[in-house]
């Protein structure tokens, strides 16, 4: 009972602090005053609630009591790095054997593959230059590939579930049941994709990103309660340690926001042009080059590779590289994150294209000749700012392991101290706030920050 009280007090304190923030209260009032924005926010919240309800609808033929909290399967999820991470991303639907168990990860996997193909295969490269029609074709290919990924992942999920908890299968694990359950899982993920598209079109923010974030955030109360339980079962000083953990979590969030928002502004001067009686150009603008241009992708790629040793279970190699708190696991993960940060930044940032666009629009960087020198200048800046960004990203990637090893934080709660969970939450919240702010500023209301602009918005 004391543990529940502590968690309740923590959330009440957070709510009280938000309620006493006059700027936030005023912003919420302004959101309500703008009819279009109000409808979009309510629409988004409604569809997110539908998604959360779907996370508790168990696949027919599976006994939910065999998978509940305290079961062997639930304990196995908490202790397994890969499965635990998938359960976090799905908001617990993975562990519930729900119809939405596979979440949006198959779609994310397909999107990454299509994105990489767009950088290497001429057919997809051409589609990227075809504007809106090309984007629609790419989206269609992504949907088809998502179904392909689901056809592989659905039976694998059912097979793993049967291996872990055979008693949960009411009618056994026949071929017919696997096909039936896989069809439901495919329909569940396609439904999530539909929800995401509707939120993007008629709601606020990016639908798929918000669905991922709400799934992660939904696990926070459960993770916090597990951490409080663990602390109160130890010796005295548990309350102090819990407070220190929450303070540390706040500082980590602030540092991550700084990482996501950090940019290097490159000045660009545009030549004056006279069209008719009007003069254009002659002003100085800036190109914002992000320190963490690759965002969360390097951690996703690195963690995907770190799951390979699990295929060689029972060997010394697997033991050394499969422990989330082990030295070699975290050292290798950090090195991979740094390498993938440079790799992915080089793919998505094209100095040659930026230089050509500037030249085409009559722009130039003061003190730098257009053409090859501009390309080299931008490339040099990106190399310099990517170095600290990659190291910071590597630290974020291994923070959950450090929190578990040196602070004794439970794995479920440690996920919120770094890695993909933290970056996704921060990135999605900032992007959504920027979109809300644009509506407010268009209606001549104050933005979400004292300056009227969110830091890093350009």
Q: Where is each model-derived feature located?
A:
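N-terminal cationic and glycine-rich segments that engage phosphates or anionic surfaces
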Residues: 1-126, 133-458
């Amino acid at each position: 009972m004391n543990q529940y009280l502590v968690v309740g007090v923590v959330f009440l304190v957070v709510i009280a602090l938000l309620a006493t923030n006059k700027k936030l209260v005023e912003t919420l009032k302004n959101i309500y005053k703008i009819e279009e924005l109000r409808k979009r926010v309510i629409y988004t919240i409604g569809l997110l609630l539908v998604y959360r309800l779907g996370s508790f609808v168990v696949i027919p033929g599976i006994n939910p009591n065999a998978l509940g909290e305290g079961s062997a399967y639930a304990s196995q999820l908490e202790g397994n790095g890969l499965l635990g991470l998938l359960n976090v991303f799905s908001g617990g639907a993975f562990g519930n054997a729900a119809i939405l168990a596979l979440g949006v990860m198959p779609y994310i996997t397909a999107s990454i593959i299509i994105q990489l193909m767009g950088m290497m295969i001429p057919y997809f490269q051409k589609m990227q230059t075809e504007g809106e029609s090309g984007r629609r074709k790419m989206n269609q290919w992504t949907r088809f590939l998502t179904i392909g990924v689901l056809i592989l992942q659905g039976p694998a999920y059912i097979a793993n579930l049967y291996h872990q908890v055979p008693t949960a299968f009411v009618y056994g694990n026949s071929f017919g049941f696997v096909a039936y359950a896989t069809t439901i899982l495919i329909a569940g993920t396609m439904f999530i994709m539909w929800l995401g598209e509707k939120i993007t079109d008629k709601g606020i923010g990016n639908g798929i990103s918000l669905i991922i974030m709400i799934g992660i955030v939904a696990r926070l109360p459960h993770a916090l309660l597990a951490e409080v339980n663990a602390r109160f079962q130890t010796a005295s000083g548990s309350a102090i340690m819990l407070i220190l953990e929450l303070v540390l979590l706040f500082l980590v969030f602030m540092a991550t926001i700084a990482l996501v928002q950090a940019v290097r502004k490159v000045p660009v001067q545009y030549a004056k042009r006279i069209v008719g009686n009007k003069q254009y150009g002659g002003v100085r603008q800036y190109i914002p080059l992000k320190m963490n241009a690759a965002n969360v992708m390097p951690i996703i790629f690195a963690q995907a590779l770190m799951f390979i040793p699990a295929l060689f279970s029972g060997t010394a190699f697997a033991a050394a590289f499969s422990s989330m708190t082990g030295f070699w696991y975290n050292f290798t993960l950090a090195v991979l994150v740094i390498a993938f940060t440079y790799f992915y930044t080089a793919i998505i940032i094209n100095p040659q294209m930026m230089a050509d666009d500037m030249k085409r629009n009559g722009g130039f960087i003061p003190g730098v000749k257009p053409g090859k020198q501009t390309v080299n200048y931008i490339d040099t800046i990106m190399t310099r700012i990517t170095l600290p960004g990659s190291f910071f990203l590597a630290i974020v990637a291994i923070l959950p392991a450090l929190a578990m090893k040196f602070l004794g934080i439970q794995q479920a709660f440690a996920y919120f101290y770094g890695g993909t969970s933290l970056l996704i939450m921060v990135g999605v919240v900032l992007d959504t706030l920027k979109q809300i702010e644009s509506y407010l500023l268009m209606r001549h209301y104050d933005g979400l920050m004292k300056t009227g602009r969110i830091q890093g918005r350009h």
